[in-house]
């Protein structure tokens, strides 16, 4: 068995039968074919920034290391073709340095470009779907590569077709991004609202987003974590009004369909759970939405903690939180919500 601890940001002690870096599509295909012939489960990882290992993984972990960025443009748009193994934050940094704007709100989101569409990553008013032109996918059973446009990806809040139809036997090899030359700043959230839209630069937004994230989110290199552990729940307007009767200052974000998105971190914080610990896992003291590997936590410690948080929030607010993090068992991905229920 090989140690998985360095390859995921929770840094929980777990092993895999084998860990292989794939630097080309041919290598991806070869490793996949070998694992199939041996009847072993396979797991594709980018930087492991959104996974929790519950046990040792009884199969082959393939690390996506497909690198390279190409840039084309026309009168109105910049087009980036980004291979799946590229670090997301470094891509954002590269784009700003090259005068290509539109990704700055997504700075410092951990992980690889190839993982961005799976979760439809988002922050500070921008989601991956807003900048996506296409996603390039390899069907490992037929070795054919195909592209899905934004609509075909079925993006939703932390949701996409890559969690469903294209989860097994497919790997994202590249993403295509389409960024307007007529750049408009997105200043809807947090301290970004204080900027003047007429004078603000993309670099200022980038710096501010980095500052906010670094001030409230623990660095995974110092404290194991997978960022936001839970999704922000979406409730009916009736349910929202009911909660608001007792909590006037409830942060909320009305949705286009009339439902209301709530801040999961605020709900957890209201239950006085910051710093709460089970085994080696704890709720982060600064940002309640983040569960941390405080002291040699096991996957089961994190599961027990997540269960406790979910139950406590449900008892107080009647809202059941869903994990944003993907849970990996000995044989592959499992339903995270079922595990913590």
Swiss-Prot record:
One of its GO terms (molecular function) is UDP-N-acetylmuramate dehydrogenase activity. GO terms for biological process: cell division; cell wall organization; peptidoglycan biosynthetic process; regulation of cell shape. The active site is at 158, 228 (proton donor), 324. It is found in: Cytoplasm. Gene3D superfamilies: 3.30.465.10, UDP-N-acetylenolpyruvoylglucosamine reductase, C-terminal domain, Uridine Diphospho-n-acetylenolpyruvylglucosamine Reductase, domain 2. PROSITE patterns: FAD_PCMH. Its cofactor is FAD. Residues 12-182 form the FAD-binding PCMH-type domain. One of its GO terms (cellular component) is cytosol. Pathway: Cell wall biogenesis; peptidoglycan biosynthesis. The keyword ATP-binding does not apply. The keyword Flavoprotein applies. Its EC number is 1.3.1.98. It catalyses: UDP-N-acetyl-alpha-D-muramate + NADP(+) = UDP-N-acetyl-3-O-(1-carboxyvinyl)-alpha-D-glucosamine + NADPH + H(+). Keywords: Cell cycle, Cell division, Cell shape, Cell wall biogenesis/degradation, Cytoplasm, FAD, Flavoprotein, NADP, Oxidoreductase, Peptidoglycan synthesis. It comes from the Bacteria. Pfam families: FAD_binding_4 (PF01565), MurB_C (PF02873). InterPro entries: FAD-bd_PCMH, FAD-bd_PCMH-like_sf, FAD-bd_PCMH_sub1, FAD-bd_PCMH_sub2, MurB, MurB_C, MurB_C_sf, Oxid_FAD_bind_N. SUPFAM superfamilies: FAD-binding/transporter-associated domain-like, Uridine diphospho-N-Acetylenolpyruvylglucosamine reductase, MurB, C-terminal domain. Belongs to the MurB family. Cell wall formation. This is UDP-N-acetylenolpyruvoylglucosamine reductase. It comes from Haemophilus influenzae (strain ATCC 51907 / DSM 11121 / KW20 / Rd). The gene is murB.
């Amino acid at each position: 068995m090989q140690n998985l601890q360095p390859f995921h940001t929770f840094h929980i002690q777990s092993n895999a039968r084998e860990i292989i870096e794939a630097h080309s599509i041919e290598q991806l295909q070869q490793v996949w074919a070998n694992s199939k012939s041996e009847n072993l489960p396979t797991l594709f990882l980018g930087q492991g920034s959104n996974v929790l290992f519950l046990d040792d993984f009884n199969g082959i972990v393939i690390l996506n290391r497909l690198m390279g960025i190409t840039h084309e443009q026309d009168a109105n748009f910049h087009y980036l073709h980004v291979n799946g193994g590229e670090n997301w934050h470094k891509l954002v940094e590269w784009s700003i340095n090259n005068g290509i704007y539109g990704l700055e709100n997504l700075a410092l989101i951990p992980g690889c470009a190839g993982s961005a569409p799976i979760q439809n990553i988002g922050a500070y008013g921008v989601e991956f779907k807003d900048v996506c032109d296409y996603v390039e996918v390899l069907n490992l059973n037929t070795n054919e590569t195909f592209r899905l446009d934004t609509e075909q990806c079925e993006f939703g809040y932390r949701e996409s077709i890559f969690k469903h139809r294209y989860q097994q036997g497919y790997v994202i090899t590249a993403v295509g991004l389409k960024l307007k030359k007529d750049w408009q700043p997105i200043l809807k959230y947090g301290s970004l609202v204080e900027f003047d839209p007429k004078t603000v630069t993309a670099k200022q937004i980038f710096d501010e987003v980095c500052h906010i994230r670094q001030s409230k989110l623990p660095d995974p290199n110092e404290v194991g974590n997978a960022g936001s552990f839970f999704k922000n729940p979406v409730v009916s307007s009736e349910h929202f009004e009911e909660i608001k009767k007792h909590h006037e200052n409830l942060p909320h974000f009305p949705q286009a369909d009339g439902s209301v998105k709530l801040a999961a971190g605020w709900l957890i914080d209201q239950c006085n759970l910051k710093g709460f610990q089970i085994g080696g896992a704890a709720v982060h003291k600064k940002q309640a939405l983040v569960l941390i590997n405080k002291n040699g936590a096991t996957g089961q410690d994190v599961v027990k903690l997540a269960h406790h948080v979910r139950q406590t929030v449900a008892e107080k607010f009647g809202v059941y939180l869903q994990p944003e993090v993907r849970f990996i068992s000995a044989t592959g991905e499992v339903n995270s919500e079922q595990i913590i229920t």
